[in-house]
Amino acid sequence: MVWFKRVKPSIRTTDKRDVPEGLWWKCEECGAMIHKKQLEDHVYTCSDCGYHFRISPYRYFSILFDNDTYQEFDDALRAGDPLGFTDTKKYSDRVHDTIGKSGKTEACRNAWGEVGGNPLVVSAMDFGFIGGSMGSVVGEKISRAVDKAVELNAPLLVISQSGGARMMEGAFSLMQMAKTSARLTLLSEKRLPFFSLMTDPTMGGITASFAMLGDVNLSEPKALIGFAGPRVIRDTIKRDLPEGFQRAEFLHEQGFVDCIVHRKELKSQIVRLAGMLKV
């Protein structure tokens, strides 16, 4: 028996499937709903609270390079499987599946172009590819970015966005820490500036190698920066951690980060620093 019967037809609302996917983004900090166009206008930051969304290397390239004009290089490098590593699946299958699902080919992209009318080489990491982890290809790309900067007599900017070394490559991954750090000495010898921008997150072997070696170490606001994560540290020392521990602002207070820069001001900051350090 039906107790209630709808006499009049309900008001028809727009079906959810009529709304294009990705049109609205939710801020992970304050929960605000942001239209895609507004998000683009604010370089993928929340206009309410300033939260910085993770973005791809290509979006950083668009923000930085004059007229969105740049030349990508060494984009054909692909990860191998030197150890035949398998956890829940084969490493080679994991790489293949990630490429197929994301359209990304590795956790780092290199490009060069003009920023403020002067040449700049940028190596940007991508958390969307296996957590932005550094394997042999990422280490090689960053090393080649150093070589390109020397070739062009230009500064180098490395944008870190990574969970650390890629465990599936074992020692091949760990040696990239030494390899990239050693390669950066070429810039010192040529008196070329190296800028390191740490974004959320910059962890593990990335922090323990090139990310902290910049002539100027910059960070986006509230980026998580450290070696082991705060939960691991807290469980190990059995003590509560200071408020904001391992966040950019905390590291800035301790002198590990030279400057916290909003993404809107990133290009102008790089232009200013490059001008100051130009020889």
Swiss-Prot record:
Subcellular localization: Cytoplasm
The organism's place on the tree of life at top rank: Bacteria
Zinc finger C4-type: from-to: 27-49
Cofactor: binding comment: Binds 1 zinc ion per subunit.
GO CC terms in record: acetyl-CoA carboxylase complex
Record carries keyword Cell cycle: no
UniProt subunit comment: Acetyl-CoA carboxylase is a heterohexamer composed of biotin carboxyl carrier protein (AccB), biotin carboxylase (AccC) and two subunits each of ACCase subunit alpha (AccA) and ACCase subunit beta (AccD).
Record's function text: Component of the acetyl coenzyme A carboxylase (ACC) complex. Biotin carboxylase (BC) catalyzes the carboxylation of biotin on its carrier protein (BCCP) and then the CO(2) group is transferred by the transcarboxylase to acetyl-CoA to form malonyl-CoA.
Protein name: Acetyl-coenzyme A carboxylase carboxyl transferase subunit beta
Organism: Chlorobium limicola (strain DSM 245 / NBRC 103803 / 6330)
Gene (UniProt): accD
